[in-house]
Amino acid sequence: MKKISLPKIGIRPVIDGRRMGVRESLEEQTMNMAKATAALIIEKIRHACGAQVECVIADTCIAGMAESAACEEKFSSQNVGVTITVTPCWCYGSETIDMDPMRPKAIWGFNGTERPGAVYLAAALAAHNQKGIPAFSIYGHDVQDADDVSIPADVEEKLLRFARAGLAVASMKGKSYLSVGGVSMGIAGSIVDHNFFESWLGMKVQAVDMTELRRRIDQKIYDEAELEMALAWADKNFRYGEDQNAQQYKRNEAQNRAVLKESLLMAMCIRDMMQGNKTLADKGLVEESLGYNAIAAGFQGQRHWTDQYPNGDTAEALLNSSFDWNGVREPFIVATENDSLNGVAMLFGHQLTGTAQIFADVRTYWSPEAVERVTGQALNGLAEHGIIHLINSGSAALDGACKQRDSEGKPTMKPHWEISQQEADACLAATEWCPAIHEYFRGGGYSSRFLTEGGVPFTMTRVNMIKGLGPVLQIAEGWSVELPKVMHDQLDARTNSTWPTTWFAPRLTGKGPFTDVYSVMANWGANHGVLTIGHVGADFITLAAMLRIPVCMHNVEEAKIYRPSAWAAHGMDVEGQDYRACQNYGPLYKR
């Protein structure tokens, strides 16, 4: 399919327009700030697909309306979706700002004494706030000399956080959420809210009945050669777990083979429906070859599909992973049970980090007392205050086994462009494929089963819809926990031991929903959550502010919270500011 161009970041160097030596003395310094900003972003950030980020710098420094308009014309022609304005000096506030109301924007005012960059920053932000076009403020903590071309660490942190979140906003705009099926078992997140996607994310919803998946499989609307490759890959790499079904429900070898084949076909066809597949056009299936321009999807499955056909566990797990029979590649975002709101949290996490996401039920809170009663052993270390069992039959990415390694040799989940084939193979080797339990999945299927390594930093998130308020975001930073094998086996056996498990210990603050682990579980807004690698809650907070989604629960340090400057005018308590500002400005793409 034709590659849609990726959004770029526009850099706007603004300058004092007075000639006779004033502007002339500032041209080089101002343009160098723009170049340094672009170089930093290009070096440190990639698109979620792995492509290098492109920065577009205005052809000239911007002193007023004419040069601002020329800059906007250039940006409009080059798909600029995010802008950063930079200056070391006084400039003319409202005459030089970026006025596009839907484009995330930041201003870096150089902290120097020779020229008042801070004064312009304050004046420009005042104009933004008065006009109702929020912008992010960037101002270094320490004074720099005029000839200092370095970017201080605190400025770099804000530039990169803004750029990551801004690119996520721009990348989602114009894409679609593919809803395959409808509401699964009454789960509210699968009541797909078109207005939410349109007004807050700038996306469309493509609703497709599950019979379309059936049609594609039955009528061979797929690449038949690829199917053979996928089957050969599975035969080489799949390690099968215990079949816990009663004897009358166990399948024979031929039946198991048919279930595997259909499971792989489901993965292929859902992928083709999301992004298209030119091979289908070569077969004369031009319409089907186009796909639905989907950046995320969900599959209802239960129960109208799973009562008669193989479940979506294998397809979802493989699509959400960073690898399959085609090798290492960008993960897809596919929500089990068509939980679109958890799918959005997965989408946020992937766009911010480039990594695969772990979709899970927020299944059980285990108190230290309960664990000791059941196992006779005490929790300790990161788990000493209790743990949450995150487990779901469906779409946890196989990367979640954490068999990949960071630069220090520690377990992690890497952006897909950093993953070696050996690491992908290690994740596969750590996974068992267990026959689905018949009473739950009458059509069969295979569930992935792995155990996440312990001591890995994660951020758990969830988007919820509240009537009268709209979407809210929950964030809980914490760590995976490794339990003694005997303890894990005893606890795991009390639920469904054929599914993947992550034992999660949130970081506690002693306040509110983070008073203790029980409070985290009790305040979680739905039955599902998402794990994103790393402590990246601050990035989620910045992204949410750009989209006007208030954060109702988080344990991120206040010093890391980065929102538009206008939020400070909405009261004195930081979280109340967020609610009032989001209500005041409304969704980014108001409908």
Curated annotation (Swiss-Prot):
The keyword Kinase does not apply. Its main location: cytoplasm. Pfam families: Fucose_iso_C, Fucose_iso_N1, Fucose_iso_N2. It is found in: Cytoplasm. Its cofactor is Mn(2+). It comes from the Bacteria. The active site is at E337, D361. One of its GO terms (cellular component) is cytoplasm. The keyword Cytoplasm applies. Keywords: Carbohydrate metabolism, Cytoplasm, Fucose metabolism, Isomerase, Manganese, Metal-binding. It catalyses: L-fucose = L-fuculose. Pathway: Carbohydrate degradation; L-fucose degradation; L-lactaldehyde and glycerone phosphate from L-fucose: step 1/3. GO terms for molecular function: arabinose isomerase activity; L-fucose isomerase activity; manganese ion binding. GO terms for biological process: D-arabinose catabolic process; L-fucose catabolic process. Mn(2+) binds at E337, D361, H528. InterPro entries: Fuc/Ara_isomerase_C (IPR004216), Fuc_iso_dom3_sf (IPR038393), Fuc_isomerase_C (IPR015888), Fucose_iso_dom1_sf (IPR038391), Fucose_iso_N1 (IPR012888), Fucose_isomerase (IPR005763), Fucose_isomerase_dom2_sf (IPR038392), Fucose_isomerase_N/cen_sf (IPR009015). Its EC number is 5.3.1.25. Belongs to the L-fucose isomerase family. Homohexamer. Converts the aldose L-fucose into the corresponding ketose L-fuculose. This is L-fucose isomerase.
